[in-house]
UniProtKB/Swiss-Prot annotation:
(7,8-dihydropterin-6-yl)methyl diphosphate binds at T53, D86, N105, D177, K213, R253, V254, H255. This is Dihydropteroate synthase. The lineage of its organism: Bacteria, Bacillati, Actinomycetota, Actinomycetes, Mycobacteriales. One of its GO terms (biological process) is tetrahydrofolate biosynthetic process. It comes from Mycobacterium leprae (strain TN). Catalyzes the condensation of para-aminobenzoate (pABA) with 6-hydroxymethyl-7,8-dihydropterin diphosphate (DHPt-PP) to form 7,8-dihydropteroate, the immediate precursor of folate derivatives. The gene is folP1.
Length: 284
């Protein structure tokens, strides 16, 4: 078994209602400093979002979303950081790209805004297509009745890739994300994680976003049944990051960059020690 190079993507929510850190980085200066700190801890990419996609969140006015993300993206990009823009709106993505972002992370998988595919094709940037089967303007979070969640999510994602390519997007610029927690039950999420090698086998880079999600909190519930809160799910997130790397994921999107980077370093050292030990034995 080998450890594939993994992109650790730091989450930077410039929002007032995200599920784990809403309101913490609304001030642009605070947001930029947090982005810089995540890069110092090992993040390869900073994913900036100005609208929460948590269950039940009210949609943010596009003008507010723009006002939140543009100054942050501009400053981080000016400092040489690879920035991703987390949005479903083409107008917001365009402004972010003009401000220096190089990746569009679209949780709707291109379904929310028909102008997104032409924009990405014209800009020639990377595009993350996430799976969210019931995504709509109202954003229903009820989990669909999948007959085979792995096969159906895989098919939906590949259909999205085909549609993007047909719209002129470079296939080599696409990344797919199974959308853990988006209109999926905990059982669906675990099935998708277990089937990561099958998703990797599609040949399209895979991004996983399990960080701090509720299905981890449920798994780690206390003896009283209380779901563990988001800030108590970092160890579980780091374990998923390490396992994702072992199974060939392209990237992991996390809130606590250091924990996942540390986990990846430990697993990498463990795996790479074997050949070195054999060499020492032979030389001795």
């Amino acid at each position: 078994m080998s450890l594939a190079p993994v992109q650790v993507i730091g989450v930077l929510n410039v929002t007032d209602n995200s599920f784990s850190d809403g309101g913490r980085y609304l001030d642009p200066d605070d947001a930029v400093q947090h982005g810089l700190a995540m890069v110092a801890e090992g993040a390869a990419i900073v994913d900036v979002g100005g609208e929460s996609t948590r269950p039940g969140a009210i949609r943010t006015d596009p003008r507010v979303e723009l006002s939140r993300i543009v100054p942050v993206v501009k400053e981080l990009a000016a400092q040489g950081i690879t920035v991703s823009i987390d949005t479903t709106r083409a107008d917001v993505a365009r402004a972010a790209l003009q401000s220096g972002a190089r990746i569009v992370n679209d949780v709707s998988g291109g379904r929310a805004d028909p102008a997104m595919a032409p924009l990405v094709a014209e800009a020639g940037v990377a595009w993350v297509l996430m799976h969210w089967r019931l995504m709509s303007a109202e954003r229903p979070y009820e989990a669909p009745n999948y007959r085979d969640v792995v096969a159906e999510v895989r098919a939906d994602l590949l259909a999205g890739v085909d549609q993007a390519v047909a719209a002129g997007v470079d296939p080599g610029s696409l990344v797919i994300d199974p959308g853990l927690g988006f209109a999926k039950t905990g059982q669906h999420n675990w099935a998708l994680l277990n089937a990561l090698p099958e998703l990797v086998a599609t040949g399209v880079p895979i991004l996983l976003g399990a960080s701090r999600k509720r299905f981890l909190g449920r798994l780690l519930a206390g003896a009283d049944g209380a779901v563990r809160p988001p800030d108590g799910r970092e160890t579980a997130t780091a374990v998923i990051s390490a396992l994702a790397a072992l199974h060939g994921a392209w990237g992991v999107r996390v809130h606590d960059v250091r924990a996942s980077v540390d986990a990846l370093k430990v697993v990498g050292a463990w795996l790479h020690a074997g050949p070195q030990i054999e060499k020492v034995r032979c030389d001795g």
